[in-house]
Amino acid sequence: MSFTIKFCSDLHINKYYPHFPSVKDLFDTNDKFIADICILIGDITHFEVIKFYKKFLQYLSPYFSLLIVVPGNHEYYCNGTKKHSMKELDQASQTLTRDIKNLEILNNKYIDIGDVRIFGSILWSYLPHTTPYRKLPIYNDNYEMLTRNEFNILNYSAKMSLENCIRQSKTDGKELIVATHYSPTFDMYEVDDNNETKDHMNYWYCNNMDDLINEDNVKVWLFGHTHTPYRKNINGTIVMSNPYVSGYCKGLGVNIN
């Protein structure tokens, strides 16, 4: 089965409220049909402004057979006067898939398209104790900002989900496309002999998962978050980012044959 994918991340459309980027702004065509699949890889805007989020997705959805959202960290930011837990924001996001029939939200989940499996995850990064910690407006069930330990639990859960998907996809004979908000590699930064970043602040943006990139059934890995355009073939796996906020390429996409 063959299909086409367009992808982008880090639109941060809250900056344009009440407007948002047009199809002409995002893609190299404004034809009635742009591609089979569009993957939005996080930091589109906040789930707390769910009506604005929905309006943007409803605008985009007719141009694609399938629209996939992989949440980012900013989806869970609470910048208003009211605190919302991550669980509450996840519940709010379910109204999107209820009202937009060709929309899938993938966070530690996958969808099969013929013999290809698409796995999506925020893929929160691991924050070692050597990395300075900064509290973000993301809240747990007690309406307290997430701790370092809670971030690392999210990282562990995402990594386990991805590893299980890679393993199961091999059993099922599926080629795998991975879409994660956080980067799976420190490759765009200066690293040591263990592929670990020399600047510990970069742990806020990336994971050291080059071993998973190298899995033979992982064919494409798309990511966001770093605001750094990136395109590289790593041992046969196409690894790319396409952030709207920096160096965005309207024509960038993936053809799956």
Regions found by a protein language model. Name each.
Residues 2-12, 115-124, 177-181, 238-244:
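Active-site-proximal beta-strand elements of phosphoester/diester hydrolases
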Residues 66-138:
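A basic- and aromatic-enriched beta-loop-alpha substructure that forms the phosphate/nucleotide-
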Residues 7-9, 38-43, 68-73, 104-108, ...:
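Active-site neighborhood of phospho(di)ester-bond hydrolases with catalytic His/Asp-centered motifs
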Residues 24-31, 54-61, 102-115, 160-174:
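Short amphipathic alpha-helices and their capping/turn segments at secondary-structure boundaries
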Residues 119-200:
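Active-site-proximal loop/helix segment associated with metal-binding centers of metalloenzymes
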Residues 12-19, 45-51, 74-84, 110-112, ...:
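Active-site environment of divalent metal-dependent phosphoester hydrolases
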Residues 2, 112, 201-202, 207-220, ...:
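Binuclear metal-dependent phosphoesterase catalytic core
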Residues 1-69, 75-81, 88, 255-257:
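N-terminal active-site segment of His-dependent metallophosphoesterases
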